[in-house]
UniProtKB/Swiss-Prot annotation:
InterPro entries: GCL_type2/YbdK_subfam, GCS2, Gln_synth/guanido_kin_cat_dom, YbdK. This is Putative glutamate--cysteine ligase 2. It comes from Salmonella paratyphi C (strain RKS4594). Its EC number is 6.3.2.2. SUPFAM superfamilies: Glutamine synthetase/guanido kinase (SSF55931). It comes from the Bacteria. GO terms for molecular function: ATP binding; glutamate-cysteine ligase activity. Homodimer. It catalyses: L-cysteine + L-glutamate + ATP = gamma-L-glutamyl-L-cysteine + ADP + phosphate + H(+). Keywords: ATP-binding, Ligase, Nucleotide-binding. GO terms for biological process: modified amino acid biosynthetic process. It is an enzyme of class 6 (ligase). ATP-dependent carboxylate-amine ligase which exhibits weak glutamate--cysteine ligase activity.
Amino acid sequence: MALNDFHVSEPYTLGIELEMQVINPPGYDLSQDSSTLIDAVKSRLTAGEIKHDITESMLEMATGVCRDIDQAAAQLSAMQHVILQAASEHHLGICGGGTHPFQKWQRQEVCDNERYQRTLENFGYLIQQATVFGQHVHVGCANGDDAIYLLHGLSHFVPHFIALSAASPYMQGSDTRFACARLNIFSAFPDNGPMPWVSNWQEFAGLFRRLSYTTMIDSIKDLHWDIRPSPAFGTVEVRVMDTPLTLDHAINMAGLIQATAHWLLTERPFKPQEQDYLLYKFNRFQACRYGLEGVLTDAYTGDRRRLADDTLRLLDNVTPSARKLGADSAIDALRLQVKKGGNEAQYMREFIADGGSLIGLVQKHCEIWAGQ
């Protein structure tokens, strides 16, 4: 299958997608009623889009093209209000978090959607297990070559994005000992992790053509890489973050990615090389397992440094770009988070350590998303 031409978009514009949990009180397990909820909200939307994801316990909130994080926040806030209103009418709850802490994957119903049914046929039970919830951020690019450079540049900071957003310590009723267990779900997929090495858009088109020979790839959407180009939108899409518990944190993560993209494309601090990825999966694992307490290893020098320290360095590097984009509030909030030494996974464990239950944890997450 031929690859679409790269659509020219305004550099650094944003699009944000949030995969949300649809909850069934009072037991606070995942509901299988997302279709009912989506049908109820479609006519009420004034901006953005609310749509299905893989299973009937998920729904996706997606902004339109936004010039800055303030516009994105306004769209997401409006959608949040509409969804919460409809959820209340149908006696459902909505929350963030990268995993539901005690749902059973065997109970998950794949949406009655041609693409998802085809994916179920290809991947079997792996698709039901992929009832996990992430935040995706699109950043606009002027051309395909810029998109490939940006993808390689952002790949340096995949551990940082994972650690800052980690919100999935519990799965199937157990503490996984990971800060972000969500990404482990995709480890059995053949396209898990980083995109195979290419140096420009022409090479990427050749890569996509060869991947399509497998008959498992019909479009870019069928590729589950950590970061992928989206030629139809003219963007690079970062896909490694857990869905946050709050809209504010989702906006802060988007602001960081937007500012990092601006810094990368204006300063060009790296000359991408295939060896950059030599320790990619090791550093990614450190972020998933330990969050901000993880340790990064430099593929060239062997130097090791705390992820928290390197994240502060990233935040300092992108601060001038954030000011130009109106995203400095996001950088300030994330800097404070790192200095306090926590993420949402840590909060969840503290809730349980203080005597809370997993049912109570999901109830609390619904209250947090509703602003209670």
